[in-house]
Amino acid sequence: MEVIPFESLTLTDEQFLAGSEDGKRVTIAGELRLPRSGTDRLPAVILLHPSGGIGGQIADWEQWFLSLGVATFVVDSFTSRGIENTINDQSQLGRLAQTEDAYRALSLISKNPHVDASRVMLMGFSRGGQDTLYASMVRFQKAHADASTPGFAAYVPLYPDCSAHYLDDDNVSQAPIRIFHGSADNYDPVAPCKAYVERLKAKGADVELTEFAGVNHIFDARAFAHPTSLPKAQTVRNCAWEERSAGHLLNVKSNLPFSYADPCVERGVTIGYDESATEQTKKAIANLVTTTLKPTPTRAP
C-alpha cells in the first residue's frame, strides 16, 4: 500500500458550479493498493467515502476489487480538511467537493506507471455516491477535470442523493453509469434517482438503476448487521433544489438560496446491512468490471 498526497481545492458549491478554481488549496491523500507486483499497467477504481469517512465497508470493497485484479485508490476527502465526519453537519463541506477530488485523483493516478489511464472507474458511497454520479456530467468535466487524461471508464454510485437538479445535468459521459439503491432508504430516498435516471435515459445515456426492495441506506456495511438509527444525522430527503442560473442553488419550495438551516432539512435516519443486496451489487459490478476494465484476475499463491 502506498499513501500518495496530492493537491485539491476546497470549493463551495457555488464556486464549483460557476467553474471556479479559486477555492482554498488543500493537500489531501489517497491510498493506492495494487493486486500484484510487476510492471504491467493495471485497471483501477477510485473510491469516494460516505459522510462517515473511510470505514470497514471501504476496506471490504478494496479487497474485493483487488481479488478481481483491479488496483484501488481510496481518496480521503476529510482528514486534511479537519473533518471527522459530516453525518450531523453536512455544511462542513460542499456537496460537490468530492467530485473535484475525484477529478484530481484521476489526473494523479493516470500518470502512475502501474495504472492504465484508460481503465479507471469511479465508485462512491452516499455523499461520495452523489459526487460519483455528478462527476459524469460533461459540464463539470469541462470545467474541472484534467483534459489531458482519459475520462472515467464507468461510474458506480451506491445509494446517492439525487435531489439536486443542476443545469445541463442530463448531458453526461458516454461511459456506463450503474446506480444501486434501496427502496427503504430514508436517508437518500431512491425516488429522485429514479426520476433522474429516466431523464438520462431519454437523452440516450448508458445508465441503469438497480433498486433493492426493503433495503436501507449503507446496505453494504457489515458493521451494521441490524438496522441502526442515527437520530441526529442530517437528511435532505424532503428537499428539492435547483440550479436556475450558473452557480446558484435554490430551494425549489422557497425560491431562496439553499441552506442546511432550511425547514426541509431533517434529522433521523436508519442504516443497515443487507447481505443479499450486497452480493447482487457485487455480481453486477463484477460484470461491469469484466466488460469495461478487462482485468487479469489475480491468481492465488
Question: Where do the language-model regions lie?
Answer:
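Primarily recognizes the serine-hydrolase "nucleophile elbow" in alpha/beta-hydrolase
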Residues: 94-173, 184-187, 191
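Cap/lid segment of the alpha/beta-hydrolase catalytic domain
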Residues: 52-59, 63-67, 77-97, 135-143, ...
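N-terminal cap/lid segment of alpha/beta-hydrolase-fold proteins
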Residues: 1-40
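Alpha/beta-hydrolase fold active-site loops
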Residues: 43, 153, 176
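C-terminal catalytic histidine-bearing segment of alpha/beta-hydrolase fold enzymes
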Residues: 206-301
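Short substrate-entry loop that stabilizes the transition state in hydrolases
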Residues: 38-42, 47-84, 164-165, 184-190
